[in-house]
Amino acid sequence: MNSNPLTPSAAAPVSDASASLTPDQFRNPFSALTWVLLGCALALAASACALWVDLPLAVWIKQSVSEGVNESFEWIGELGESGPYIGVALAFYVIGLVGLARGWRNPVRMSYASMARGSLLMLSTLAVGGLVVLVLKRSVARARPELFFEKGIYGVGESFSRAQLYNSFPSSHTYAAFAVAVVLGILAPRWRWVFLLLAALVAMSRLVNLDHYLSDVMTAAGIAVLVGHVLAPRVLGAGYQWPLRAPWRWWKK
């Protein structure tokens, strides 16, 4: 008898079609070296934008975008709020664990194991990358575009000072949107480009609303892609059973 109720052996049988909704044998599309090179390329591109593109682009947006367009993109920017995604993912994770423990039959075409793994990947990607973004925001302390247009300030302030409007780099809304898009794209590859398009609209809203510079949103999107693909094999892989256990049992063999 299985002594741990929150393991795959307690799950109800599911069809092959439902099990395929989560790619249990997910593998990164690139090697570790390729990811490092892509990260370096992103850092160089962001640096180039900060030197030569960010400010001219922000000035052009300020002069060219109408108030109606600005207000429309404010609504789009709401899709970058991480709170609702965390709440939904947490609810699905709890349902997945309970369904596994009690051997429920899932009324939808998805196993409870897939539900638990997918929702945990969402939570972990938002949490891990969100922490990286927070540390960068506090340490870099980049002035937001608002400070340039009000006081002519373009650059960085004192690290970890928590000064208002010195937390532009990178964009947390863009990170949340791309983190969700990357995870959903991994779980539902056929819809990958739809999710990424929605995330790109959120990133664009941060530029149009003059909340961030181009390098802020570029870096946030890159972090989301990297974190999501690094975590996916360790959460979705069939060889890793910890996602199917309650959090207080993650470290138990």
Where are these regions (language model features)?
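N-terminal transmembrane-helix/juxtamembrane module of multi-pass inner/ER membrane proteins
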Residues: 2-93, 138-154, 160, 252-253
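Membrane-embedded catalytic cores of phosphoryl/pyrophosphoryl-handling enzymes
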Residues: 23-31, 98-99, 152-253
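Membrane-interfacial segments
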Residues: 56, 61, 96-107, 139-144, ...
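Interfacial segments of alpha-helical transmembrane regions
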Residues: 95-96, 102-135
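Residue-level signature of transmembrane alpha-helical entry/exit and packing/kink sites
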Residues: 32-39, 114-122, 217
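Alpha-helical membrane-inserting segments
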Residues: 54, 92, 132, 136, ...
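Alpha-helical transmembrane segments of integral membrane proteins
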Residues: 75, 86-87, 118-121, 190-197, ...
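Lipid-exposed faces of alpha-helical membrane segments in multi-pass integral membrane proteins
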Residues: 41-45, 83, 87-94, 124, ...
